[in-house]
Swiss-Prot record:
Protein name stated in the entry: Protein SEY1 homolog
Residues in the Cytoplasmic compartment per record: 1-754, 800-891
Compositional bias segments (type: Basic residues): 882-891
Family matches, as Pfam families: RHD3_GTPase, Sey1_3HB
Organism: Leishmania braziliensis
EC number(s) given by UniProt: 3.6.5.-
SUPFAM superfamilies documented for this protein: P-loop containing nucleoside triphosphate hydrolases
GB1/RHD3-type G domain segment(s): 52-318
Membrane-topology descriptor: Multi-pass membrane protein
Length: 891
């Protein structure tokens, strides 16, 4: 059962209710023979009198939401309300709560102790401080009669956390609770996170300064006794290091620093902090990560409070060291709180700091208001569509004027306080400046985006086309030799195509290199567009009517570049997300492109079903490589401070002024890069065969979207396809590929006009005399050759294509080489070429090398279908018979 001792508004519970509460929690632990029942049957007061001084009070201070209530509940078996992190983080304990420790817990068992005679009562009336007069007023009859009780109650106080959003900068209530706690407790627990050791604000060292100051106020009287000092127990929570000594040494140095910085009475001028406190330290393991070790440390710490035989027992006296009997505790608390609430000097650390803070805050608000009024005028002019040249320079000059005025008004105050408020003023001034500059920059960025948006989106399509060209010529790592087995009949073509397709094994490492090449190419092409936007002098076709303004305002120019870069990144990501949502259609489009066009961009025709069957595996492989490129977004928008690619906007930042707004804009500069970390480098699809779905990288952990992680890994918001979506896309893709392949096979079979194999030998046998006559007559031979070249050219070409598709590679490749050489020689002799054969061959070879290096670096492939050649020809639309798409959006 808990008592709300002090509510959030600073109201203490009534004295009568305090008495009733203490009676209700203490009476069960007191033997009836120990209590002195009155004539009115008031057994409760007798129970409190029976306890006398034989009790202890423990309190806890610390930052808000730092686990104070959790620690007390585990340590003393109390039931204070704890923070529910699933709902929100905020204030849980408001004011102060009191509860009785569960003495049935291991380490807190009741033990027989002798009650020490009250030592402080005779001198209480002689104390001079107002708080100690309250003590004397409360302790009027502090002698306890009868034998001591069998148990020593332990009262636990849970105080409101400091540094909370609800209180804001108001530290008055915090200091009042600190003074109230020190006037009550025997042991004060300071709850501190181990990671905050060495910090001032995060470790709540301002609270410790308050505790030291108010404790000096309590004991600045002439009758001060050296034994009259509480125990300060510093508990370091979530400690994960092996050696606590460095952290404890740092904590002690922080205490000494605070102690030396406060103003002390003459009697404590040359003393250390140990003159006012018994300092103790304890470290506890992580509450969540080391739950068992944490509970073990709780049991150990509990013995410090309950086992008098423990070497670290905290209560040097077996009785309440303030000398206040339990029946006088309600009056003592009431008088102490009344004295604290009327003490106005508790509102501030010192009068001098208060005055400096008040004056600096007033000057800061005045200058900030003046600047905002100034900036609002320019913002209104921008809303009216005015063209403001050198706007950033005007705003920077006004910022300097406001900061100079602030320093002039506060030059006589504490430099530390002035510096703090000056930094706050500068930050808020720059924020107001950026608000105006962003309004102008967004208008310019809109103009730029309207002119280059299509180029950014085309870079995605161009990178995908280059990926398909490289994937189309990527050889398989292993597979059956399809050239040794030919279908016996035309109706077995579908079965043979399926067998050939499943027999191919993909080169997984080469496919992953192609995926990396796709993202590297995409990042380079987007950077080229960004570089054009950042080029000086600015391009008129990009900036339009803002070109003159951009030349005269470098800060605005770089701010526009920041906005444009971010917009490019978002547009590219949006486009890739859209492609991933319809991954099956995107893959099938790549399959159709690879099946319909050669690697050089020319249209591909199949004279036989065998040629079509040989081209299908490479086309299917190209679509699977596209899937590997779509399932994770690999571009990043990184700060220019951490990016190695600083050559992109050297011209944009070279002439940038060193003003405050320019520094902010430069700090916000980002680059679009492709840079996989260690986790992302392993987050690629693994390929085996064409009839097996790519293996999803399940061994690489992917955090949830709401998980706050500082370590570098796979970004959850960049995963475009889950494992289920990847498998589903593969299955739909295979179905569409099979359907398209069947249609093409049937079309090839229907258009097959090849002569039967016995026709050619029969013609030679039956027409041997005529053939011999033609061969022996030069004029007739020339006439026949001309007629065949004119009227039967297409027939011979189709037969040659059929031979290329069906003939053995050992024969096709040499014959093709000879034919190409003869064709080049004839064209050079006829003078219709673009130079000599060696020159053109060298030029074509260099173009091929340059194209390969530029499009897909780090991927070495050999053509298995056609000779690669450079081409800038726009790819035509695929044939209508190959358009069999449906809109499937994958979850």
């Amino acid at each position: 059962m808990n008592l709300h001792l002090v509510d959030s508004d600073g109201h203490l519970e009534a004295e009568k209710k305090l008495t009733e509460y203490l009676t209700s929690i203490v009476a069960p632990s007191v033997s009836p023979s120990r209590g002195s029942a009155t004539a009115d049957g008031d057994y409760g007061n007798g129970a409190l009198e029976a306890v006398g001084l034989n009790y202890h009070v423990v309190g806890v201070f610390g930052g808000q939401s730092s686990g104070k209530s959790t620690l007390l509940n585990h340590l003393f078996g109390t039931h204070f309300q704890m923070l529910d992190e699933t709902v929100r983080r905020g204030q849980t304990t408001k004011g102060a709560f009191m509860a009785l420790a569960n003495t049935a817990l291991a380490g807190l068992e009741a033990s027989d102790v002798a009650v020490v005679a009250p030592r402080l009562a005779p001198s209480a009336a002689d104390r001079s401080s107002r708080l100690n007069h309250a003590v004397a007023a409360a302790v009027t009859n502090n002698t306890t009669g009868g034998a001591p009780p069998t148990g020593s109650p332990l009262l636990v106080l849970d105080f409101e956390g400091t540094d909370g959003l609800e209180r804001g900068e108001d530290q008055c209530f915090e200091r009042q609770l600190s003074l109230f706690g020190l006037s009550i407790v025997d042991t004060l627990i300071i709850n501190m996170w181990a990671v905050d050791v060495g910090r001032f604000n995060a470790a709540n060292l301002s609270l410790l300064r308050t505790i030291f100051e108010v404790n000096l106020q309590l004991f600045s009287h002439s009758n001060y006794e050296a034994e009259e000092k509480p125990t300060l127990l510093v508990v370091l929570r979530d400690f994960t290091e092996d050696d606590p000594l460095p952290s404890l040494t740092t904590v002690r140095k922080s205490f000494d620093t605070i102690w030396e910085s406060i103003t002390r009475p003459a009697q404590f001028e040359d003393t250390s902090i140990d003159a006012l406190f018994h300092l103790k330290y304890y470290v506890m393991p992580h509450y969540r990560l080391q739950k068992e070790e944490f509970m073990a440390s709780v049991e150990t710490l509990r013995r410090w409070f309950g086992d008098s035989r423990c070497s670290d027992y905290l209560f040097s006296y077996h009785s309440m060291f303030r000398g206040v009997p339990l029946d006088g505790l309600p009056a003592y608390l009431t008088n102490c709180w009344a004295a604290i609430r009327t003490s106005k000097d508790l509102d501030i650390p010192t009068q001098r700091e208060m005055l400096a803070q008040h004056r600096c805050k007033e000057a800061k608000e005045q200058e900030l208001m003046t600047y905002r009024d100034f900036a609002r005028g320019y913002e209104d002019r921008l809303l009216r569509g005015e063209m403001l040249l050198r706007l950033s320079e005007v705003l920077d000059e006004e910022m300097e004027t406001r900061l100079t005025a602030f320093y002039r008004q506060t030059k006589l105050y504490s430099s530390a306080v002035v510096g703090q408020y000056a930094n706050e003023l500068e930050t808020e001034l720059v924020d107001a400046t950026m608000q105006v500059l962003n309004r102008l920059s967004k208008a310019i960025a809109t103009e730029v985006l309207s002119n280059v948006e299509s180029r950014v989106l085309n870079s995605v399509e161009e990178s995908l086309r280059q990926l398909l060209k490289s994937a189309q010529t990527l050889p398989f790592s292993a597979g059956e030799d399809s050239s040794t087995t030919e279908p016996a009949e035309a109706h077995d073509a579908d079965e043979d195509a399926a067998r050939l397709l499943g027999a191919q094994r993909m080169d997984s490492a080469a496919c992953q290199r192609l995926v990396r090449g796709f993202w590297r190419t995409l990042s380079i092409q987007v950077k080229e567009v960004v570089a054009e936007v950042a080029a000086m002098p600015p391009r008129a076709h990009l900036y339009g009517r803002y070109a003159v303004l951009i030349v005269q305002d470098p800060t605005t120019r770089l701010n526009v570049l920041n906005i444009v870069t971010d917009a490019f990144f978002q547009k590219v990501k949006s486009r890739l997300v859209s492609m991933a949502n319809s991954a099956c259609d995107t893959m099938h489009s790549g399959f159709e492109r690879s099946l319909t066009y050669n690697s050089d961009g020319t249209v591909r025709f199949f004279a036989t079903t065998r040629g079509l069957q040989k081209a299908v595996p490479a086309a299917v492989q190209a679509g699977l490589v596209v899937l590997g490129s779509l399932f994770y977004f690999r571009l990043k928008l990184v700060s220019a401070a951490v990016s190695d690619d600083d050559d992109l906007d050297t011209g944009a930042t070279a002439a940038l002024p060193q003003s405050r707004s320019a520094r902010r804009v430069r700090h916000n500069r980002c680059h679009i890069v492709f840079d996989d970390n260690d986790a992302e480098a392993a987050f690629y699809l693994s390929y085996s065969t064409l009839d097996t779905a790519p293996k999803y990288p399940c061994d690489v952990p992917v955090p949830t979207l709401d998980c706050d992680r500082e370590e570098v890994g796979v970004a959850a918001d960049c995963v475009l396809l889950s494992q289920q979506a990847t498998v589903r896309a593969y299955e739909l893709y295979k179905q569409k590929c099979d359907f398209t392949t069947q249609l093409q096979l049937r079309a090839a079979e229907a258009g097959n006009q090849r002569l039967p194999a016995w026709v050619i030998p029969a013609l030679f046998i039956l027409g041997w005399n005529e053939l011999l006559y033609v061969l022996t007559s030069p004029a007739l031979l020339v006439l026949v050759v001309v007629i065949c070249a004119v009227f039967f050219r297409q027939f011979f070409v189709s037969q040659w294509h059929a031979f290329e598709e069906t003939g053995p590679a050992s024969v096709v490749i040499p014959v093709r080489t000879v034919v190409h050489a003869l064709s080049a020689l004839v064209r050079s002799l006829l003078g219709d070429g673009q130079g000599s054969c060696p020159e053109r061959a060298a030029r074509n070879g260099s173009d091929v090398v340059a194209s390969g290096e530029r499009e897909m670096a780090h991927v070495k492939v050999t053509s298995t279908h056609a000779d690669p050649a450079p081409s800038n020809t726009t790819v035509p639309t695929a044939q209508a018979t190959m358009r069999h798409r449906t809109t499937h959006k994958l979850d």
